[in-house]
Amino acid sequence: MGRVKLKIKRLESTSNRQVTYTKRKNGILKKAKELSILCDIDIVLLMFSPTGRATAFHGEHSCIEEVISKFAQLTPQERTKRKLESLEALKKTFKKLDHDVNIHDFLGARNQTIEGLSNQVAIYQAQLMECHRRLSCWTNIDRIENTEHLDLLEESLRKSIERIQIHKEHYRKNQLLPIECATTQFHSGIQLPMAMGGNSSMQEAHSMSWLPDNDHQQTILPGDSSFLPHREMDGSIPVYSSCFFESTKPEDQICSNPGQQFEQLEQQGNGCLGLQQLGEEYSYPTPFGTTLGMEEDQEKKIKSEMELNNLQQQQQQQQQQQQQDPSMYDPMANNNGGCFQIPHDQSMFVNDHHHHHHHHHQNWVPDSMFGQTSYNQVCVFTPPLELSR
């Protein structure tokens, strides 16, 4: 059975093209090597596989750069002549092999490409000449005596100014876009310190402090002096470390406060430093220093919350001591009317010279007289205990 003759046309299958290239590549490389040795010629063979892999071959005494330079020195006419000679030789070879190949198809494709490139070159040359003509008009305006020509120049100037204004407006909008984004984030309350941008935002981000509350909810506050004032803290609150750290006591050891006042304190104390209330009272400052007038009110509110939290923990400690040693407190003290209230910001000191035992309770309850949360001090006196003789 004879060998099937392959038609000279493009193979549709990718795998078939790769197999055919691999088989015939070795044959053409062998022929090129034999030709360079037998005829002692400068030869360069460069091929790319269907997958894009390059294969290059050159003679023993040949250099690829030298051969390409020699070919580049040929004139276009000489190149076309050599090309036609090669195609005629291929045509004779195909006729002997009974292959139907149209050589003019190869020539036509090449001629169309050259014609297209020639047309593009002509177009570019015409545009270049037009640009030179316009520039020559602007360099010699004093020599122009035609009114129509001057009108054309004026119209060209007007269009150029319009294009410049459009470009300027577009550039200005691109510059204002980051500022508008930052303003939008500020009004929507989304990460204001980061939205302001610049080095100041990074410093504010590093100065953020976390304030835990009794409900174990972490609340973030900026570390600005207008939010956490330390100016009068030592003189107003003796012990304030508990306001910044969570209590390590378990929940089952926290006793509920007896009486109606203690129940109110328990309800208000659990949510006094909640996330929602802090979000309403300690909002982020507006840009350009517009919250300077609100610093005093914020300081008063923060001090009130700190005092309330501090005194609640003192009450819890006293209640635990009462449970451990009930003999130190008289349960009839409250029934005998020994509890009275002292107005806010006033102090009362009672000295007992008859060896009466008294005990001070600093209980803080809301007061509606001041329009905000204020507190009254309650002193509870207990009569002395009779010692057994």
Swiss-Prot record:
Residues 312-324 have a biased composition (Low complexity). Keywords: Coiled coil, DNA-binding, Nucleus, Transcription, Transcription regulation. InterPro entries: MADS-box/MEF2_TF, SRF-like_MADS-box, TF_MADSbox, TF_MADSbox_sf. SUPFAM superfamilies: SRF-like. One of its GO terms (cellular component) is nucleus. GO terms for biological process: pollen development; pollen maturation; positive regulation of transcription by RNA polymerase II; regulation of pollen tube growth. Residues 77-131, 293-325 form a coiled coil. GO terms for molecular function: cis-regulatory region sequence-specific DNA binding; DNA-binding transcription factor activity; DNA-binding transcription factor activity, RNA polymerase II-specific; protein dimerization activity. Residues 310-343 are annotated as: Disordered. Gene3D superfamilies: Transcription factor, MADS-box. PROSITE patterns: MADS_BOX_2. Residues 1-61 form the MADS-box domain. Expressed in pollen. It is found in: Nucleus. It holds the Pfam family SRF-TF. Probable transcription factor that forms a heterodimer with the MADS-box protein AGL104 and is involved in the regulation of pollen maturation at the late stages of pollen development and pollen tube growth. Forms a heterodimer with AGL104. This is Agamous-like MADS-box protein AGL65. The gene is AGL65.
